[in-house]
């Protein structure tokens, strides 16, 4: 339990930051899910468009500190690889 005023304030700040980070990660996951769904059902153009929309969102996660840059690159690389394999 936080004893000092500054420690109590830090607990409040961490709670706020955690909530924001959870929302950001949820948003990123939603975009990735949309791309995967487009790859599974739609034509190649729809999947490519979904990735084009998702890519800035994924890299924004890196900028905001919720994703490691290598993980973001891996996600984008794998999704684009799946799109390239589409007929």
UniProtKB/Swiss-Prot annotation:
The keyword DNA-binding does not apply. One of its GO terms (biological process) is translation. It comes from the Bacteria. Keywords: Ribonucleoprotein, Ribosomal protein, RNA-binding, rRNA-binding. Pfam families: Ribosomal_S20p. InterPro entries: Ribosomal_bS20, Ribosomal_bS20_sf. SUPFAM superfamilies: Ribosomal protein S20. GO terms for cellular component: small ribosomal subunit. GO terms for molecular function: small ribosomal subunit rRNA binding; structural constituent of ribosome. The keyword rRNA-binding applies. Binds directly to 16S ribosomal RNA. HAMAP family: Ribosomal_bS20 (MF_00500). Belongs to the bacterial ribosomal protein bS20 family. NCBIfam families: S20. This is Small ribosomal subunit protein bS20. The gene is rpsT.
